[in-house]
């Protein structure tokens, strides 16, 4: 499943190709995604200029403006479990899992295609007419926690928001209502770097341990973005390139292999129907 690094890699890859282009045409082949694509999406988007591309958690947010009226809205895109957004120089024949195309023109008349592909159809492409000020109140966004690269996210924030929480710290990280984007791979890796066992009740973490964890979360996610994300099966960036952070994982998907730090076999358990990997010697 694409997590925060994969979504951010996609966003950065789209920026130089998509921002400043006008939507000349929209083709929706399959509306049955996680939430149905609106019947009038084509009419809403046609002729609008893509002014910005932002990210909130695992959502990509494309601001699309009608230049004649300065009316702006947002295209919300979630990659689900297997989704990708590819920039294509032309429009090759669509495959069975290519659900939506945006045809984009620039001022010079050159044309590209932004193609949404999602074999399992757990992704989403939705239109919102909300203003920038109102967008945080969107039903899909209002319950999200702080961004891990926000200057306010630190050990004190994590410590304050985990008091009284008896759930395991990895489960709390995955919930996304305290801090967003720390998915399964990066939760296991962040906890390893912080030396914290994933089954530790979140409310029992000291301020010092929360400080280490907050730092580890930021460092792990930043490294993953630099490496182009993780490609376990389906993920590729907007240019079709695979990520390679998974090659540098300390514990994730390394059950039974020796810990890269101490040599103890990495242990695998299941938490909330998700696989967790950790070192019994390095994490306490």
Swiss-Prot record:
Gene3D superfamilies membership: 1.10.8.50, MutM-like, N-terminal
Residues in FPG-type zinc fingers: 250-284
HAMAP family for the chain: Fapy_DNA_glycosyl
Quaternary structure and partners: Monomer.
Protein name: Formamidopyrimidine-DNA glycosylase
Family statement: Belongs to the FPG family.
Binding-site list for DNA: 97, 120, 165
The reaction(s) this protein catalyses: Hydrolysis of DNA containing ring-opened 7-methylguanine residues, releasing 2,6-diamino-4-hydroxy-5-(N-methyl)formamidopyrimidine; 2'-deoxyribonucleotide-(2'-deoxyribose 5'-phosphate)-2'-deoxyribonucleotide-DNA = a 3'-end 2'-deoxyribonucleotide-(2,3-dehydro-2,3-deoxyribose 5'-phosphate)-DNA + a 5'-end 5'-phospho-2'-deoxyribonucleoside-DNA + H(+)
One GO process term, biological-process aspect: base-excision repair
Assigned keywords, A-Z: DNA damage, DNA repair, DNA-binding, Glycosidase, Hydrolase, Lyase, Metal-binding, Multifunctional enzyme, Zinc, Zinc-finger
EC number(s) stated in the UniProt entry for this protein: 3.2.2.23, 4.2.99.18
NCBIfam families: fpg (TIGR00577), PRK01103.1 (NF002211)
GO molecular function: 8-oxo-7,8-dihydroguanine DNA N-glycosylase activity; class I DNA-(apurinic or apyrimidinic site) endonuclease activity; damaged DNA binding; zinc ion binding
InterPro entries attached to this UniProt entry: DNA_glyclase/AP_lyase_DNA-bd, DNA_glyclase_Znf_dom_DNA_BS, Formamido-pyr_DNA_Glyclase, FPG_cat, MutM-like_N-ter, Ribosomal_uS13-like_H2TH, Znf_DNA_glyclase/AP_lyase, Znf_FPG/IleRS
Cofactor note: Binds 1 zinc ion per subunit.
The keyword rRNA-binding belongs to this UniProt entry's keyword annotation: no
Catalytic residues as annotated in Swiss-Prot or TrEMBL: 2 (schiff-base intermediate with dna), 3 (proton donor), 58 (proton donor), 274 (proton donor)
Cofactor(s) it depends on: Zn(2+)
Entry function: Involved in base excision repair of DNA damaged by oxidation or by mutagenic agents. Acts as a DNA glycosylase that recognizes and removes damaged bases. Has a preference for oxidized purines, such as 7,8-dihydro-8-oxoguanine (8-oxoG). Has AP (apurinic/apyrimidinic) lyase activity and introduces nicks in the DNA strand. Cleaves the DNA backbone by beta-delta elimination to generate a single-strand break at the site of the removed base with both 3'- and 5'-phosphates.
Family annotation (PANTHER family): FORMAMIDOPYRIMIDINE-DNA GLYCOSYLASE (PTHR22993:SF9)
Organism for this UniProt entry: Cupriavidus pinatubonensis (strain JMP 134 / LMG 1197) (Cupriavidus necator (strain JMP 134))
């Amino acid at each position: 499943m694409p997590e925060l690094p994969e979504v951010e890699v996609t966003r950065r890859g789209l920026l130089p190709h998509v921002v400043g282009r006008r939507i000349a045409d929209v083709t929706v082949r399959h509306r049955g995604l996680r939430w149905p694509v609106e019947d009038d999406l084509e009419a809403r988007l046609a002729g609008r200029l893509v002014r910005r591309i932002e990210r909130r958690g695992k959502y990509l947010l494309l601001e699309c403006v009608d230049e004649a009226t300065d009316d702006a809205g947002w295209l919300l895109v979630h990659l689900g479990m297997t989704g990708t957004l590819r920039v294509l120089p032309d429009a090759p024949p669509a495959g069975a899992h290519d659900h939506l195309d945006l045809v984009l023109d620039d001022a010079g008349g050159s044309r590209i295609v932004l193609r949404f592909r999602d074999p399992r159809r757990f992704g989403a492409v939705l239109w919102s007419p909300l203003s920038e000020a109102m967008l945080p109140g969107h039903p899909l966004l209002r319950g999200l926690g702080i961004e891990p690269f926000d200057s306010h996210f630190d050990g004190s924030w994590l410590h304050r928001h985990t008091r009284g929480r008896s759930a395991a710290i990895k489960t709390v990280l995955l919930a996304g209502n305290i801090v967003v984007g720390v998915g399964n791979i990066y939760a296991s890796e962040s906890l390893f770097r912080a030396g914290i066992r994933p089954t530790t009740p979140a409310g029992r973490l000291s301020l010092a341990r929360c400080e280490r964890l907050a730092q580890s979360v930021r460092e792990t996610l930043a490294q993953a973005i630099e490496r182009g994300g993780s490609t376990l099966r389906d993920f590729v960036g907007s240019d079709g390139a695979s990520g390679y952070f998974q090659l540098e994982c300390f514990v994730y998907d390394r059950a039974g292999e020796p810990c890269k730090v101490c040599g103890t076999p990495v242990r695998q358990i299941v938490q909330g129907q998700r696989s967790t990997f950790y070192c019994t010697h390095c994490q306490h």
